[in-house]
Amino acid sequence: MRAVRIQTGSLIVGAGYPEPDAETGVGVVRVLRVLITETDLGVARGIIPHTGVLGQAFVGVVERVVGPDPRALTGRTVVASPDLPEPTSDLARRGMGAHDPARAVLGVGGRDGCLAELVAVPTGALVAVPPGVDPDRAVFALPLARALHAAQIVRIPGKPYVTVLGDNLRALLAAQVLARLNASVRLLGTMPDRLDRCARWGVKHRHRDEAGRWGDQDVIIDSERSAESFELACGMARPRGTIVLLGETPHARQRSACDLAPVIERELSVVGARCGSLGEGVELLRSGTLDLDGLITRRFRLDDAKEALRAASDPSSIAIVVDADR
């Protein structure tokens, strides 16, 4: 089959890769759309160790399920969690399988991902997509689940003041989700087209260079996760406020000199947000309350995946999608 993979340290695109050899309890999915993620970029650059197929965020149709299929997934359109823990592990039993250090992860560490014509995923990680949600929306299920998780981590009574730092895809999704959850939200970014998009959504927005540091925000969602953005977040948060670091990928662990004095002085809480309920993300997609139109900056055929990865590295891109069925 055609696949985008790392072999002997090189990125290869094309046919000749073996189809998945699925075991009992695994669904073989024909991939329709793949959303290029930061993790994919880290793998392609050699920052994240991997041998095999890239790709984590996708939507596809289940061709077959090996063994019993009690959920009748065969023929259904699905999305999948990239985190694949052993269901009987201690953390999985406690509902935290995505944090199991022994878990497999799609597209990382030797586990074949979804940037191919077919991908094999345990049925427990598959989530059916409702008939009314088309693939171009369903492909956002994973980043949307993460944005929703970031919003749910911090629960403040009333109408909290929330600032979202950044204007990347996860920031734009988080701003919409938080506004829907009755927060007073503003997004601070630098790109005029992203700020214009917020205006159409009814989300408050400003250029980040124009924002003051009044120390009055209940929650700061930092989607950039840099030393500079963290310093800005500390200056905006109220005493005993919360900073949520919204991310997805191990290769973001760059060492940076962050001044932690404000965290101590102002008694700030700093929380990481990486995982999320894919089912809740799909349900939010089904509701149709989020505006996802125009978030796909460019789309590519599977054979043009190298160009897609380059495009995804461009800060002017919001979301890059590969049509794996072309």
Predicted regions and their residues:
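NAD(P)H dinucleotide-binding glycine-rich loop of Rossmann-like/cofactor-binding domains
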Residues: 84-165
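Glycine-rich beta-strand-centered segment in the early N-terminal region that forms part
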Residues: 20-34, 44-93, 130-132
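Glycine-rich cofactor phosphate-binding loops and adjacent beta1-alpha1 units
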Residues: 154-156, 186, 192, 196-267
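Mid-domain Rossmann-like dinucleotide-binding core that forms the NAD(H)/NADP(H) cofactor-binding site
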Residues: 133-210
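Local beta-strand N-terminus motif with an aromatic residue
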Residues: 116, 216-218, 292
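Short glycine-centered segments of the SAM/dcSAM-binding site in methyltransferase folds
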Residues: 77, 161, 241-243, 269
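C-terminal substrate-binding/catalytic core of Rossmann-like NAD(P)-dependent dehydrogenases/reductases
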Residues: 250-298, 306-307, 316-317
